Every structure is written in structure tokens, then in C-alpha cells.
């Protein structure tokens, strides 16, 4: 399969031989149907449309299952074809290379359901549910515990994997259990202790297991108006301190305690520094924004430049929070 790219990551679809995974000279992609499901696999799917940075090349193969059975069928298809599997949630904490991703990309954004249990105060959600939407839903019911998460740009599955957090709270604080799917199609329910949580990370990162659903412990019974008001304040604070006028992935670097990554970058004089269409945000230095026409390589090289400059001045190695997918060798 081939990817034709111009400025702004324009992907040209080439056809896929559904039996041998070989390209043809046609520009019309054949459709791959997963047996016993209503799921189809796309070839050469442009990933820029599925990432918050709005950059990146194409996936060799892309599938977005809508239920557990289709997800298991997708993994079986990958195993039988000896395909590498990459999981994609909301694409809000990712940088996909301009060359795209080989193998099969499985998007979990269509895995959707949520259940608020008033007897236990527990919220069970599918991996593809939006974290901000869940925060608003909980607030409107008078359930406390997710107010801080209203500005987290991602899905429940991604939040569980990276231990998403804000305002001194995080997913690990309220997670009861997570259901994960192994490459062989078996399901397992894991506790927070088994997930090995620490700051913005878990044992699921870098692994091949996929989160299918999670159960969170919340606190029902509060006045909905008060919970909504607190949630609105968190959202207002987020909007006033972080850039939302341009595409970004959220925070780029983990905070190297006791310092703030944004403060270190700002004190190094890098606010507003730009490579191509990628810029260190003026509002918050731990954000890199796509000012328009940025390539993944622009963002990657800006990340490396920031790391180098901060290391030179402060002798501190900034560790990226953003996950990089694809090949970046020789990008800078």
C-alpha cells in the first residue's frame, strides 16, 4: 500500500487486495468485511481526521468496532494476518507520524454505553465514552467525583490506560476495576493495584491489551445544581488557562516534580517558538498547537527542541506525555 502526502497531510487512497494485503493500481479501496459482524475494515485510512492534532499519515488498515464481538473479531483478523495492532481512542494524546501506522488500527470510539448504579454509586462505562460527557452526565445527576474531568479531552479507555488527571485528582483514585481484552480474545477484570498506576501511567501503556470498559466509584446524592456549578468552574478554569483555539494534544510533557513542565519551558524562553506550523502555545507553554498546515514532523522536532533546551538550562529531562505512533527517525 502507498501513501501520497503533500503539505497538510493529504492522503491518497490506494486499493487493497482483501486476500493478500497487496496494493492494486485502482484508486478505489475494496471493502473488507469481518465475518459474523457488521464491521468493515478500511485500507489507507487518513488518521489526521481521528487525532486532535489533525496531523498524521494513513493506517494500513483501520476498523472501528461497535461492540465486543466485533472487537474480538478484529483481533482475530489481525492475528490470522500476522498484523501489528494499534489501539486508538479519541486521538487526543497522540502524535501519528507523517508516514502513518502499519498493521491494523483499532478505534474504540464507537464502543459506547454508560450505567449509573444508584445502589452502589458506581458508574460503568465502555471504553469509547467521552470523559467530558460523563462528567456532565454525573453532575446533572448530582453525582460527585468527576467534576475535575470535564476538561479532559479523551475517552474512558484512554483515561484508564494513561491515568488521566487534573486538579490533584486522577482516574486511579476512583477506579474500581477495568475490563481488558487480550490479543487472544480473552477478557480479564483488573483492579487498580494490578494496573500498577503511577503519575500519568499504568502497566497497560505500551502493551497489547485493550480496555473495553471500566467501573468508577462516585458519590451520588448531592444537589445537582451545586455539582453542575463546580463542574462549570473547572471548565471555565480550563478554558482560561489552556489554548483551545488551535488543534493540540493537551499537555505534551509530564510534570517533573516538583516543577511544572510549562513553567520550565516558559522560563527557557520558548513560548511562541515555532517550527513549521507547530508552535509552543502562548497561553500555556506545555501545549504545542497546530497553527495551520503543521506536519507531524514539525511537532516532533519542536518536542525534541524543547527537550534539548530545557536539558541545557535546567539539567532536567522532560518526558513526553503524548504517545508517538509510527516512524519518526530522521524527521529532524
UniProtKB/Swiss-Prot annotation:
The active site is at residues 200, 251, 321. Pathway: Cell wall biogenesis; peptidoglycan biosynthesis. Disulfide bonds: none annotated. Its EC number is 1.3.1.98. This is UDP-N-acetylenolpyruvoylglucosamine reductase. The keyword Ribosomal protein does not apply. It is an enzyme of class 1 (oxidoreductase). It catalyses: UDP-N-acetyl-alpha-D-muramate + NADP(+) = UDP-N-acetyl-3-O-(1-carboxyvinyl)-alpha-D-glucosamine + NADPH + H(+). Residues 55-221 form the FAD-binding PCMH-type domain. It is found in: Cytoplasm. One of its GO terms (cellular component) is cytosol. It comes from Nostoc punctiforme (strain ATCC 29133 / PCC 73102). Belongs to the MurB family. Its cofactor is FAD. Keywords: Cell cycle, Cell division, Cell shape, Cell wall biogenesis/degradation, Cytoplasm, FAD, Flavoprotein, NADP, Oxidoreductase, Peptidoglycan synthesis.
Amino acid at each position: 500500500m502507498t501513501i501520497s502526502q503533500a503539505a497538510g497531510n493529504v492522503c491518497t487512497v490506494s486499493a487493497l487486495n482483501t486476500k493478500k494485503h497487496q496494493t492494486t493500481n485502482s484508486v478505489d479501496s475494496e471493502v473488507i468485511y469481518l465475518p459474523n459482524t457488521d464491521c468493515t475494515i478500511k485500507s489507507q485510512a487518513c488518521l489526521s481526521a481521528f487525532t486532535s492534532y489533525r496531523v498524521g499519515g494513513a493506517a494500513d488498515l483501520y476498523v472501528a468496532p461497535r461492540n465486543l464481538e466485533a472487537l474480538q473479531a478484529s483481533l482475530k483478523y489481525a492475528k490470522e494476518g500476522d498484523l501489528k495492532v494499534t489501539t486508538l481512542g479519541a486521538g487526543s494524546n497522540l502524535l501519528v507520524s507523517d508516514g502513518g501506522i502499519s498493521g491494523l488500527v483499532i478505534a474504540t470510539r464507537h464502543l459506547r454505553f454508560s450505567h449509573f448504579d444508584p445502589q452502589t454509586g458506581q458508574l460503568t462505562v465502555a471504553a469509547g465514552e467521552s470523559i467530558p460527557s460523563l462528567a456532565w452526565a454525573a453532575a446533572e445527576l448530582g453525582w460527585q467525583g468527576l467534576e475535575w474531568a470535564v476538561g479532559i479531552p479523551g475517552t474512558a479507555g484512554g483515561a484508564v490506560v494513561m491515568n488521566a488527571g487534573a486538579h490533584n485528582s486522577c482516574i486511579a483514585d476512583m477506579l474500581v476495576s477495568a475490563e481488558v481484552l487480550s490479543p487472544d480474545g480473552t477478557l480479564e477484570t483488573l483492579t487498580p493495584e494490578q494496573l500498577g498506576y503511577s503519575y500519568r501511567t499504568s502497566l497497560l501503556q505500551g502493551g497489547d491489551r485493550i480496555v473495553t470498559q471500566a467501573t468508577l466509584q462516585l458519590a451520588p446524592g448531592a444537589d445537582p445544581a451545586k455539582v453542575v456549578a463546580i463542574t462549570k468552574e473547572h471548565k471555565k478554569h480550563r478554558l482560561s488557562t489552556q489554548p483551545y483555539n488551535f488543534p493540540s494534544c493537551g499537555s505534551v510533557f509530564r510534570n517533573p516534580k516538583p516543577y511544572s513542565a510549562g513553567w520550565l519551558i516558559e522560563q527557557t524562553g520558548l513560548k511562541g517558538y515555532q517550527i513549521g506550523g507547530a508552535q509552543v502555545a502562548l497561553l500555556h507553554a506545555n501545549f504545542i498547537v497546530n497553527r495551520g498546515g503543521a506536519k507531524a514532523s514539525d511537532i516532533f522536532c519542536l518536542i525534541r527542541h524543547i527537550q534539548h533546551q530545557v536539558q541545557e538550562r535546567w539539567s532536567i529531562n522532560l518526558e513526553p506525555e503524548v504517545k508517538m505512533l509510527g516512524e519518526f527517525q530522521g524527521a529532524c
